[in-house]
């Protein structure tokens, strides 16, 4: 009897329809998910945090807001209703308190970049911007940091940067005199050429020819294609697509975009290596390449890491600069009195316009600060994972399994911190004006702490030079009829804020 029992059980199992097995496994998975959702909603420490009831059960509403490019507005509406800390998903909390935000992002806080940042790598390995491990990030950052200091940029690169900016302004001026100039496109080309030139000595004549470097084109395609998203959100569909892509050319272009990008990126490494020993055109990858050749145990990079970092630097250094300049020009051209004052200020500069001279112009710098406050290029989510023991923020305990988010759209527009927060008022930044301590720690258009933007000084240099040269060479510029308040509404496009129309045109 005992010996036959297992056999009978096996026969019984063999006769169970396959459909039933799928239903059983699927049902068990659904039940486990429901149990986890209910545990999180009703037993997690996060249950005490204010927020809409549905956020305790699902992130669907938040996901829809992200998909619709209006996450910043949705999250802000929750802050307006529930306060400076709000639950936006079952295990996701958004904070609009400047003191808590500083606690999260300061050096040594224990908070690390959330898993979301895996999406921001164009290659198969982590890069300078999405490392979650603080030590790995620090080691990689040291390879590039010296080249991005303000003194280094002014001594080695300012003439090159100024020439690229000046040519861009002339192209804008020419187009504007012929009809209209689409400035977002031109500023993007300017930033592309600058970053390519500094990082790997590439991007030659991008502005002059009006076309992007092939590596930049492939990078943009890679970061925006379906395969990149499926790889992170639906791996089975991604691998199915790669399998089918071997037989279907159209699918091959989509699902093998990473390989195509790396093929285009081979010239990045080749150009960087060729310039390494040259007395003239050096680049920011010189130290990284040298460390790799010496087989250093600390910091040596292989070709894959070089290409991936080049892609990350281009993503972080191109669109943000272009978008910041676009909104700055739009803000000023909407205010004729301010435009006249700024044109007069830059007209008073003697000789060649230098970054140091621009840094001393009060109106120019006040305009840059205020446009970055209202229309900074990164208005959206900056998610972080808490330390292993969790953290207390705004009086609430946040467990290590949660994700804590801050967004500059809320920090830069808080009525508790800023007077008339939604009004463009450059005078708040002029010498003699007094900003509250909360305002000072709230203003972080380039991030803060150890993860502050590596290229912050390069960004500021381009903003200063481009603003000065534009208003010196294009006095009397005005917005084209196609550029309206509606077309310039900022949308939260995944990793950057941009105009709804994705363009901004001016005339002379």
Curated annotation (Swiss-Prot):
Pfam families in alphabetical order: p450
Classification via PROSITE patterns: CYTOCHROME_P450 (PS00086)
SUPFAM superfamilies from the UniProt entry: Cytochrome P450
Record InterPro entries: Cyt_P450 (IPR001128), Cyt_P450_CS (IPR017972), Cyt_P450_E_grp-I (IPR002401), Cyt_P450_sf (IPR036396), Cytochrome_P450_monoxygenase (IPR050121)
Protein's GO biological process: aflatoxin biosynthetic process
Major location (coarse): membrane
GO cellular component: membrane
Keywords: Glycoprotein, Heme, Iron, Membrane, Metal-binding, Monooxygenase, Oxidoreductase, Transmembrane, Transmembrane helix
Name used for this protein in its record: Cytochrome P450 monooxygenase aflV
Gene behind the chain: aflV
């Amino acid at each position: 009897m005992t010996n036959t029992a297992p056999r009978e059980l096996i026969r019984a199992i063999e006769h169970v329809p396959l459909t039933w097995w799928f239903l059983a496994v699927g049902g068990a998975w659904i039940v486990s998910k429901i149990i986890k959702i209910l545990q999180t909603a009703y037993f997690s420490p996060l249950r005490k945090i204010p927020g809409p009831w549905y956020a305790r059960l699902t992130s669907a509403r938040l996901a829809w807001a992200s998909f619709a490019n209006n996450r910043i507005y949705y999250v802000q509406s929750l802050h307006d209703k529930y306060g400076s800390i709000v639950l936006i998903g079952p295990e996701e909390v958004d904070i609009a308190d400047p003191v808590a935000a500083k606690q999260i992002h300061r050096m040594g806080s224990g908070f690390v970049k959330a898993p979301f940042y895996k999406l921001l790598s164009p290659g198969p390995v982590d890069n300078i911007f999405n490392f979650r491990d603080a030590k790995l990030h620090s080691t990689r950052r040291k390879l590039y940091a010296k080249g991005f200091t303000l003194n280094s940029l002014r001594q080695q690169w300012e003439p090159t940067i100024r020439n690229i900016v000046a040519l861009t302004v002339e192209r804008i001026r020419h187009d504007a005199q012929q009809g209209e100039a689409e400035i977002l496109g031109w500023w993007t080309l300017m930033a592309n050429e600058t970053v390519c030139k500094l990082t790997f000595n590439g991007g030659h004549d991008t502005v002059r020819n009006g076309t992007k470097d092939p590596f930049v084109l492939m990078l943009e395609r890679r970061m925006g294609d379906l395969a990149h998203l499926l790889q992170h959100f639906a791996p089975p569909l991604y691998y199915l697509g790669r399998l089918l892509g071997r037989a279907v050319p159209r699918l091959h272009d989509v699902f093998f975009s990473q390989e195509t990008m790396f093929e285009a990126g081979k010239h990045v490494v080749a150009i960087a290596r060729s310039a390494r020993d040259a007395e003239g055109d050096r680049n920011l990858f010189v130290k990284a390449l040298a460390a790799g050749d010496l087989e250093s145990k600390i910091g040596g990079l292989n070709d894959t890491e070089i290409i991936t970092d080049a892609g990350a630097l281009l993503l972080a250094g191109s669109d943000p600069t272009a978008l910041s300049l676009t909104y700055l020009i739009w803000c000023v051209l909407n205010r004729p009195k301010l435009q006249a004052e700024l044109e007069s200020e830059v007209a008073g500069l003697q000789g060649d316009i230098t970054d140091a001279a621009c840094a001393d112009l009060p109106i120019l710098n006040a305009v840059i600060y205020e446009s970055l406050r209202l229309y900074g290029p990164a208005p959206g989510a900056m998610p972080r994972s808490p330390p292993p023991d969790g953290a207390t923020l705004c009086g609430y305990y946040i467990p290590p399994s949660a994700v804590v988010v801050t967004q500059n759209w809320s920090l830069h527009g808080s009525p508790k911190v800023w007077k008339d927060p939604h009004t463009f008022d450059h005078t708040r930044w002029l010498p003699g004006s007094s900003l509250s301590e909360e305002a000072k720690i709230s203003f972080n258009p380039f991030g803060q702490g150890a993860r502050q933007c590596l290229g912050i000084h390069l960004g500021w240099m381009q903003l200063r030079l481009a603003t000065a040269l534009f208003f010196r060479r294009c006095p009397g510029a005005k917005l084209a009829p196609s550029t309206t308040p509606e077309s310039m509404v900022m949308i939260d496009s995944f990793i950057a804020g941009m105009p709804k129309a994705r363009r901004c045109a001016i005339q002379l």
